[in-house]
Amino acid sequence: SVDYTLERAGIAHTAEEVNWLVAQIEKLKPFPDVPAAMEKLRKRYKLAILSNGDPDMLEAARAHHGIAFDHIISVAAAGAFKPHVATYTKAAQIVGVAMNEILFVANHAFDCVGAKAAGMKAAFIDRRKRPFGKWPYQPDMIVADFAELAEQLS
């Protein structure tokens, strides 16, 4: 998906550059509030990731984030990229939960809009205090960080 994104943006790149970038993405650590908030949420909810990343990249990243998820899902399972409705539908099927029972949490408006269009609820993590925008679908919740999300959902 990194290669696809760079090509769509018209950014010239080599295979080595893509490999380096993916290796850096795999090593990303969560924000400091995330691990404790996820543990709190884990007590009441199933936790899953739906990512535009490739399955191999997501598996490699698992070692670096240290958070136990019930499911780590690549959009490759749906054959499309977010925000295509098929990605959200496939994730719901994998998790085994109805679309309207899912709260999709994201820090990108397009993820929230896609989830809402697919029939999910959405929470927007607004760390940068920026307006959500005048999208046709708005999130059900807007919170500053995962700590606030966990507090509101507990």
Give residue ranges: language-model regions.
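Short secondary-structure boundary/capping elements
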Residues: 29-33, 83
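Asp-based, Mg2+/Mn2+-dependent phosphohydrolase catalytic module
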Residues: 39, 50-154
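Surface-exposed cleft-lining segments at the edges of enzyme active sites
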Residues: 19-27
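Transmembrane alpha-helices of multi-pass, membrane-embedded glycan-processing enzymes
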Residues: 26-29, 107
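Catalytic-core regions built around general acid/base machinery
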Residues: 33-44
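A metal-dependent, Asp-based hydrolase signature
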Residues: 1-19
